[in-house]
Structures are given as C-alpha cells and as structure tokens.
Amino acid sequence: MARFITGEDMTEIYAVGSSLVNPAIGAEGDVDTAAVLLKTARGVVVQISNSRRATYGYDQRIEVHGSLGMIRAGNQHESAVEFAGKQGFLTDPVQNFFLERYADAYRIEMEHFVTALQKGQLPSPSGHDGLMAQKLADAATRSAQTGQSVRL
C-alpha cells in the first residue's frame, strides 16, 4: 500500500513490536502490536501502526498528509447514520470483520484479474508488486528482531 500511495519504492524500514495485550501470541514468537516506519529515496516517510486488538470492531484507517492538505479514509460502520446530541456523536459499530468490509473490493479485484487475463493484459497489482510487498515484510521482520533499521 505504501508503494502504491507514494509511487515510490521504500529504501529503509524500521519495525518494533510487542505482545502485551495477548502474551500467548508472544509465546508463539509473534506480536499483537507493531509500529513500522518506512522511508523512500526522496525522503517520504510512511508510518504504520498495527494492533490485533480493537474491542470496537475492525479498525483500519488511512491518512495521507501533503503540502496541499490531508486526505483520510475512515472506518466503515454498519450504517452511515450518525446521531449528534448533548453527549456527543453516536454511530453504529464499525464492521467487525475484514470479509464484511472488503467483500466488494475482493469481488472487484477478482473481476479485474479475470478480465486482464482474458484480454492478455497484466493485472494490477503485478507479481512484482507482490514480490516487493514480501521483501518489505521480510525486512520488517528482520528489523523487529534486531532492533535496527534495514536498508533496502
């Protein structure tokens, strides 16, 4: 996602994580909370914050800050209804599972893939995009294990 949004490859990554919310995950060698910083050759900084525990639903948001402002995509709620009163704002809960939230996106992605193959075109994301995502994931793991940033 960072490569897609910035249009650039990452040149450095630093990752840190812990398993304080669910120690059983830590006992298996994994983390329940992680933070990742990435940097491009041009100096663009990408910050990622992950947690496996959001008691209020499937929380996934994105913000992109730039010289002209900021754009944000927030959580999808069970409905678009919002109530504002003396107590503040009330909304329906956020969708609780990624399959609910991304069902349409997965369907559209699959349709694109099939259409690209039928027309002899390259699908997007490409195999190269997948390879680069895997390299970033591997580098993030190395960084978290060593406590050092990893140059890419």
Briefly describe each language-model feature range.
Residues 22-28, 40-108:
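NAD(P)-dinucleotide binding in Rossmann-like oxidoreductases
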Residues 4-8, 67-71, 143:
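Phosphate/oxyanion-binding loops and surfaces in catalytic or ligand/nucleic-acid-binding neighborhoods
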Residues 32, 106-109, 126, 132:
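An acidic site on a long C-lobe helix of protein kinase domains
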Residues 1, 9, 60, 109-112:
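Hydrophobic alpha-helical segments typical of transmembrane helices
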Residues 68, 110, 134-137:
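Short amphipathic alpha-helical/adjacent loop interface patches that line ligand
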Residues 41, 115-152:
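C-terminal helix-rich "cap/oligomerization" subdomain common to oxidoreductases
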Residues 34-36, 60-62, 141:
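Residue-level detector of beta-strand structural context in well-folded domains
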Residues 1-45, 51-56, 128:
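Rossmann-like dinucleotide-binding domain that binds NAD(P)(H)
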